[in-house]
Amino acid sequence: LALEGSTAHVQAFAPRPMLFVLGLGDLAEALAAQGALVGIEVRATDDPAEIGALGPTDGLVVLTHDHEVATPVLARVLGATQGGYVGSLGSRHTQRERIARLVAAGVADPESRIFGPAGLAIGSRTSQETALAIVAEMLAVIRGRKGGHLRDDAGPING
């Protein structure tokens, strides 16, 4: 940037990604630790009112299996944004039930917008491994990547 013979350098910074976690416990703690490693701010809560709107680099992971708590939060978040990452923990049966409830609540196309069961398929066995799989999936989604093996991807290795 040049101003009347002076030169100034401008460096823009993207906002830090935010991951909202609905539910507390070991996995929420592991998500906070994993998020910190890669520069994601994690806010874990049991209070649905604390879940904010998602920006294009933000995410939500629903850990609770209580449909009465999860459905309104997911409906609100999916209704307010087309971007970001939305994941939900639970079995495939739980995911089908969750999708059916969201469709009944009038949410458009929830099955293509929710990543559930959340996380990349790395064979997770511990809370820490599950957190790694979820954070990696979130990063892949917000960066427009598939999250597969680099050897199978012709795109850029970094970024």
What is each PLM-predicted segment?
Residues L24, A28, D66-H67, Q95, ...:
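Generic structural signal for well-ordered, non-membrane alpha-helical segments
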Residues L24, D46-D47, T64-D66, P117-A118:
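Fold-independent oxyanion-binding glycine-rich loops
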Residues G83, L89-G159:
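Adenosine-phosphate binding glycine-rich loop
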Residues F20, R43, G59-V61, G87, ...:
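Hydrophobic/aromatic beta-strand patches that form the interior of the parallel beta-sheet core
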Residues A33, L37, A75, G79, ...:
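Short, well-ordered alpha-helices that flank and scaffold nucleotide-derived cofactor binding pockets
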Residues G52-E97:
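Rossmann-like adenosine-cofactor binding region
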Residues L1-D46, E50-T57, L102, V141, ...:
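Segments forming oxygen-rich coordination pockets for charged ligands
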